[in-house]
Design a protein with these regions (language model features):
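Single-stranded RNA-binding regions, centering on S1/OB-family and related RNA-binding modules
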Residues: 547-783
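Long, highly charged, low-complexity intrinsically disordered interaction regions
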Residues: 56, 63-81, 87-90, 422-520, ...
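Structured, non-catalytic alpha/beta "coupling" segments that mediate domain-domain communication
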Residues: 74, 88, 99-102, 225-238, ...
């Protein structure tokens, strides 16, 4: 445990006792959100980011340490464990590095070397290596049926020597470092026939770059090309220096007689070209791939975090619009709680072309149900549908409607899911998509947790990375986001409750079932009546579960029940009541936190409690804002260089950001065009859902590519790491048809419960998040 603690402390730049405390809590079953918020004294202030890193690395290092012990045991059994080898085994920082060290010693009963030694050639190989003797003379008198001639015997001895030399870990480690300095990654098109079907990879049909300098997104693009049998990849490098180093290691230039020297130098060449170099090539590419995957997963995680925590429009009656052409445009009205009030299908486009009837139906639904927001899915026919809605709004200006473009990525996945069938059993599968779109605008977090994060469309090469690792990473992000906001236990769906600290899908469903059978929970203590929700689970979850208008005012806040006694002391000291102190800034700021420190409550907890009392149930998400698309620009062909546009960031990568400007094809703002100053990390400048002003740099209608800039016109381009824009072929987000979208009344409100967002007035128009998700299309006179 000591080595493990020391390593984690070093990696996280914290004290060992902090790591020990966190490990103890994790091993006892505490979740990261719970530890981060309610056990600050125990960990001495480790935050959620540090705890996530610790949790991830703890699992990895435990696996590594366990494997290390098995390797050491195996080496001992083989009598191969020298002091130097033990040092190297203990110094291996990754599983791959450990396996590389162990590989030459792994028992192999089918190797050519093992077979040759079994035939009695081992002593002869040692003699040739150590003594000044002609190899042919050394073999005089040897006879074995598996090696009937001199050539086969000499080959077999080379296999023995090569395997023995491979156990010189100091040498092979040095050879790897030497080769890595000149290593180049090369890609070539697999065949002429692949040029057409794999044209999206054409920038890599004849490409090479220093392996050390290949950025992660470019490597993943090439690996995808290889996976699709379009590209062939090869790690190339110089052989002279490694060969010279091998000859120096074994002093081969001084070997006598000449026949022995020639033989051993040939063996050295075979050792390098046939044994060591292929292993090193594979190792270097694997290391680079794993690093690229980790980086891609981090990009996905950050994008997902921003998306989930994007601004909710709040409790406002919303019309969800799921565009379509032949199958019609699906409509669904949901109330402030997300319950379905009405649904319909209109056919404004070919082949029916019922524009007049469609306008009438849109206006009827908006007027009859007093609709406030119109959420329009951004897939096929979205701009045509937006134009239709805009026409209806112009003809019914008294309705004071606001229309917003919402990402429908993953809507079809949700619509066809078992969860959608449970929530909307009476609705056709195609209508469910419209319901989901409306709810996404009201509360993105509550709705998006129902969808596999990989279907949301904010990942960078998400299908090319380790899927198990990706799933764990994204699940942690969702868990952190849900717990940072909190949920109303009396309205939340099982889908979002399942991410609350201490809960799982099964217990979440038990809570929902109990609520249906027994009515709303009046206080947090009532949760203990739920089957399988014991004391330990209650301790973990209670602080993140809110109860509005219950018998205990503190239940609507993030104050944990274990701190209610502390609040009572504060209230008593200030001669007031719990109800009166909540939200009373004047009283709270008069409290001296240090006066209440005791063995049970430390200063961090007291300060957190006071902050929560001042603004109970605060929602960490940004304010709802809107942006505008130009109504006269709906296709790439309508763009021109120099055009100034407003758009929304849909995806952030390591080489720039993609922005939806309303033309069915996201434009790329290269990293060098994000700002006037140097930008090392695009995530520090923009995030998914951010509304930005862009300028069109270039338009390629044939290739459907748009390059944008966020720098003021005339400003000198900021220097950026050299990252050719070839990578955008694989990254551009095109608005594609969603396929047949599954076509109802959802359980009472799934929305998370930070303080419930206030319905924004139409004229405030504040959207901001949901990635491309939330955009107001600007309509004159639309307030």
């Amino acid at each position: 445990m000591t080595d493990l603690v020391q390593q984690l402390a070093k990696e996280l730049a914290v004290r060992p006792n902090q790591v020990e405390a966190a490990i103890k809590l994790i091993d006892e079953g505490a979740s990261v959100p719970f530890i981060a918020r309610y056990r600050k004294e125990v960990t001495q202030g480790l935050d959620d980011t540090q705890l996530r890193q610790l949790d991830t690395r703890l699992a990895y290092l435990r696996d590594l340490f366990e494997r290390r012990e098995k390797v050491i045991e195996s080496l001992k059994e083989q009598n191969k464990l020298s002091d130097d080898l033990l040092v190297r085994v203990n110094a291996a920082e990754t599983k791959n590095a450990l396996e590389e060290i162990y590989a030459p010693y792994r028992p192999k009963r089918t190797s050519k070397s093992f077979k040759a030694k079994e035939a009695g050639l081992g002593p002869i190989a040692e003699k040739i290596f150590a003594e000044a003797i002609d190899p042919v003379e050394a073999l005089a008198g040897f006879s074995h049926e598996d090696y009937p001639d001199l050539e086969s015997q000499l080959d077999a001895i080379q296999h023995i020597l090569i395997d023995d030399w491979a156990q010189n870990i100091a040498l092979t480690t040095e050879l790897k470092a030497t080769f890595a300095k000149t290593a180049v990654l090369k890609s070539l098109v697999a065949s002429d026939e692949k040029k057409e079907v794999g044209k999206k990879f054409r920038d890599y049909f004849d490409f090479s770059e220093s392996l050390n300098k290949v950025p992660s997104h470019r490597l993943l693009a090439m690996l995808r090309g290889r996976q699709e049998n379009v590209l062939g990849l090869k790690v190339d490098g110089e052989d002279e220096a490694p060969l010279a180093r091998i000859e120096t290691e074994y002093n081969l230039d001084a070997v006598q007689p000449q026949a022995r020297q020639d033989y051993l130098k040939q063996t050295a060449k075979l050792f390098w070209l046939g044994k060591v170099r292929p292993t090193i090539e594979h190792s270097l590419l694997t290391e680079k791939r794993l690093a690229a995957e980790a980086e891609a997963m981090q990009v996905f995680a950050e994008n997902l975090r921003h998306l989930l925590l994007s601004a909710p429009a709040g409790a406002r009656t919303t019309l969800g619009v799921d565009p379509g052409i032949r199958t019609g445009v699906k409509l669904a009205v949901v109330n402030e709680s997300g319950d379905v009030l009405a649904h319909s299908t209109i056919y404004p486009f070919a082949p029916k072309d019922d524009k007049a009837g469609s306008l009438t139906e849109l206006a009827r639904l908006c007027r009859e149900f007093n609709v406030d927001l119109i959420a329009i899915g951004n897939g096929t026919a979205s701009r045509e549908t937006e134009a239709l809605v805009a026409e209806m709004m112009a003809a019914n200006s008294d309705l004071k409607l606001t229309r917003v473009s919402v990402s429908e990525a993953g809507a079809s996945v949700y619509s066809a899911s078992e969860l959608a069938s449970q929530e909307l059993p009476e609705l056709d599968v195609s209508i469910r998509g419209a319901v989901s779109i409306a709810r996404r605008l009201q509360d993105p977090l509550a709705e998006l947790v129902k969808i596999d994060p990989k279907s949301i469309g904010v990942g960078q090469y998400q299908h090319d990375v380790n899927q198990t690792g990706l799933a764990k990473t994204l699940e942690a992000v969702v868990e952190d986001c849900v717990n940072s906001v909190g949920v109303d236990v009396n309205t939340a769906s099982a889908a979002i409750l399942g991410y609350i600290a201490g809960l799982n899908k099964s217990i979440a469903q038990q809570i929902v079932d109990f609520r249906k059978e027994n009515g709303r929970f009046d206080n947090r203590q009532a949760l203990k009546k739920v089957p399988r929700l014991g004391e330990r689970t209650f301790e973990q979850a209670a602080g993140f579960l809110r109860i509005q208008n219950g018998s205990e005012p503190l239940d609507a806040s993030a104050v944990h029940p274990e701190s209610y006694a502390l609040v009572s002391k504060i209230v008593e000291a200030k001669a007031t009541t719990v109800k009166d102190i909540i939200g009373n800034t004047e009283i709270i700021r008069q409290v001296n936190a240090e006066e209440f420190v005791d063995d049970q409550f430390g200063l961090p907890t007291i300060q957190d409690v006071l902050s929560e009392l001042e603004k109970p149930g605060r929602d960490p998400r940004p304010e709802f804002r809107t942006a505008k698309f130009r109504d006269d620009i709906t296709e790439v062909s309508q763009l021109s260089e120099g055009m100034q546009l407003e758009g929304v960031v849909t995806n952030v990568t390591n080489f720039g950001a993609f922005v939806d400007v309303g033309v069915h094809q996201d434009g790329l703002v290269h990293i060098s065009e994000l700002a006037n100053e140097f930008v090392s990390d695009p995530h520090k400048v923009v995030k998914p859902g951010q509304i930005v002003q862009v300028r069109v740099l270039t338009v390629d209608v044939e290739r459907n590519r748009v390059n944008l800039s966020m720098r003021p016109e005339g400003a000198a381009a900021a220097k950026a790491p050299r990252q050719p824009r070839r990578d955008q072929n694989e990254q551009r987000t095109e608005r594609k048809p969603q396929g047949k979208r599954p076509q109802q009344a959802r359980p009472q409100g799934d929305r998370p419960q930070g303080k419930k967002p206030q319905a924004a007035k139409p004229q405030d128009n504040k959207i901001g998040g949901l990635g491309a998700l939330l955009l107001q299309a600007g309509i004159k006179g639309s307030k």
